């Protein structure tokens, strides 16, 4: 499958998600190539229908600029009580609809938007599907003051930590001024147990395990089909 065919599949999946958004609702919007098609589809609805949104919050400047370019006003998460729906991508999704996110470094905001949403839908292509969470480093955002100690503890736990670096080879700094340690242990060991360990580790701000958060995944398959999978 070439890129144009893959993009067409992503567009179809994104359009399906866009049709699930109710006019007048509060919407959370993630980021990524498939989400970009989703935003375009929202713009088409705005142009062709009597479609508007009460509030929109997003997890990236890229999505914010795209939305504003289509005439949508983007608000801060602090400006809303709760999103009716959040649509985002994912780096990996397992059979239970649990996932790894944060490959772009915005995991803390992504999780805050997701946790403050009544419903969460992820749009992915089939390359992101796994039976057990694996094949993608798990990002952990840590405070600089205790980052070295966190790194050593992760090493001792056999989690194969790696500093995330920027384009200049320096430690990547998040929007909130923190570092990211990517855990390369593969497959991700006992996701719920690891999440609990990270949640109780001093210095950890947030991690990329999104467990029991996603309600529905729209999947673009290479055979041209679009699958809608819901949490059981």
UniProtKB/Swiss-Prot annotation:
Enzyme active site: 110 (proton acceptor)
Binding of substrate, residues: 31-34, 88-91, 101-104, 128
EC number, UniProt record: 5.3.1.6
NCBIfam families named among the record's database cross-references: PRK00702.1 (NF001924), rpiA (TIGR00021)
The reaction(s) this protein catalyses: aldehydo-D-ribose 5-phosphate = D-ribulose 5-phosphate
Record keyword Cell membrane present: no
Protein name per Swiss-Prot or TrEMBL: Ribose-5-phosphate isomerase A
Example of a GO MF term: ribose-5-phosphate isomerase activity
Described function: Catalyzes the reversible conversion of ribose-5-phosphate to ribulose 5-phosphate.
InterPro entries in UniProt: NagB/RpiA_transferase-like (IPR037171), Ribose-5P_isomerase (IPR050262), Ribose5P_isomerase_typA_subgr (IPR020672), Ribose5P_isomerase_type_A (IPR004788)
Organism annotation: Lactobacillus gasseri (strain ATCC 33323 / DSM 20243 / BCRC 14619 / CIP 102991 / JCM 1131 / KCTC 3163 / NCIMB 11718 / NCTC 13722 / AM63)
UniProt xrefs under PANTHER family: RIBOSE-5-PHOSPHATE ISOMERASE 3, CHLOROPLASTIC-RELATED
Family per record: Belongs to the ribose 5-phosphate isomerase family.
Keywords, ordered alphabetically: Isomerase
GO annotation, biological process: pentose-phosphate shunt, non-oxidative branch
Biological pathway: Carbohydrate degradation; pentose phosphate pathway; D-ribose 5-phosphate from D-ribulose 5-phosphate (non-oxidative stage): step 1/1
Assembly description: Homodimer.
Lineage: Bacteria, Bacillati, Bacillota, Bacilli, Lactobacillales
């Amino acid at each position: 499958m070439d890129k144009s065919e893959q993009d067409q599949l992503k567009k179809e999946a994104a359009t399906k998600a866009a049709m699930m958004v109710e006019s007048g609702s509060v919407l959370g919007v993630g980021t990524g190539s498939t989400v970009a098609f989703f935003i375009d589809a929202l713009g088409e609805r705005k142009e062709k229908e009597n479609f508007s949104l009460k509030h929109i919050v997003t997890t990236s400047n890229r999505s914010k600029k795209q939305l504003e370019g289509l005439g949508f006003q983007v608000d801060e998460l602090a400006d809303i009580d709760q999103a009716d729906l959040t649509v985002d991508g994912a780096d990996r999704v397992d059979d239970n609809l649990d996932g790894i996110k944060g490959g772009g470094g915005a995991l803390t905001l992504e999780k805050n938007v997701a946790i403050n949403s009544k419903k969460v839908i992820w749009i992915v292509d089939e390359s992101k599907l796994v039976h057990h969470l694996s094949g993608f480093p798990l990002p952990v955002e840590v405070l600089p003051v205790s980052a070295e100690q966190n790194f050593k503890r992760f090493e001792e736990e056999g989690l194969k930590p790696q500093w995330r670096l920027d384009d200049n080879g320096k430690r990547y700094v998040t929007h909130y001024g923190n570092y990211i340690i990517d855990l390369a242990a593969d497959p991700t060991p006992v996701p719920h147990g690891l999440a609990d360990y990270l949640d109780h580790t001093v210095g950890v701000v947030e991690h990329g395990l999104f467990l029991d958060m996603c309600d529905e995944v729209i999947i673009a398959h290479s055979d041209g089909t679009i699958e809608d999978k819901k949490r059981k």
